[in-house]
Amino acid sequence: MPRHALQGAGLGFRRELIPELESGVPEAIRFFELAPENWLRMGGRSAKQLRAFTERHPFVCHGLSLNLGGLKPIDTELVTAVGAFMHEHGIGLYTEHLSWCGDDGMLYDLFPIPCTGEAVRHTAARIRQVQEMLGRRIAIENASYYVAPPGAELSEAGFIRAVLEEADCDLHLDVNNVYVNSRNHGFDALAFIRELPLERVVYMHMAGHYVEPDGLIIDTHGAEVIDPVWA
C-alpha cells in the first residue's frame, strides 16, 4: 500500500469558499482537504465545481463518520463509496478520527476510545479492514476529548502508537487537539508529541478553538490559530 506525502499548507474545502477560490487560489495553498461524507451524493452545479478543483489541485479526504473505535460493524457501503469517490477524483489519501461516533445510530459527535490493549486490537483490526477495502494506507487523527474513559492501561500517546503499529497505518497529527487536550487534562503538549511515531505523520491540522467561561477549551475549528499552537 503506497504512502502519500503532502507538502506546503492546505485549506479545508467548503462550498461557501468556492466563489472566492474560483477567482484564484492563493499560491500559499498547496492542497485542499474535504469531508467525503459531505460530497458523496452531491450532484449538479456543486459536483461540477468540485470536479473543476480536483482536476487542478491535490486533495485529501478527511472522514467524519467511519466509527473506527465503535462496536457496530464497519459501514462497508460507506467505505466502498469513499473508495469510488477517491478514484473518481484522483485523491490518494484518506484520514479518519481515532474515536467512536455511533452504536445503534449516529451520535454526531466524536468520543474517545478507552486506552486499553483490547481496544488497540479491536480498533487496529477495523483500520486494517478499511485499508484492505480501499487498497491503500489510511491515516488516523488524534481526537480531542473532554472526559477521559476509565480503565486506561496505556497513556493516550502510548495507545495511539500501539494502534498505528498494530494496524500499520499513518498518523494525521492534529496539533490543536493536542493543545486542547493538554490544557483540559493537564499534560505537557510537547512531551506528548515527542512520544508519537512522527515518522508516520502524513500531514497536520492547525486550527482554532473556543474557551468556555469556566476555562474549558472546546475544539471548534472556528477561530484563529493561537501562537502556542503554532509553536
Predicted regions located by residue number:
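Boundary/entry segment of secreted carbohydrate-active catalytic domains
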Residues: 1-21
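Active-site beta-loop-alpha junctions enriched in small/polar residues
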Residues: 14-16, 34-39, 64-67, 98-99, ...
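Acidic (Asp/Glu)-rich catalytic clusters
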Residues: 21-27, 44-61, 77-92, 128-133, ...
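Conserved, mostly hydrophobic/aromatic
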Residues: 32, 94, 138, 174, ...
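Gly/Pro-rich active-site loop or hairpin
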Residues: 41-43, 73, 110-120, 181-231
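Conserved radical SAM core fold
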Residues: 67-68, 101-107, 210-217
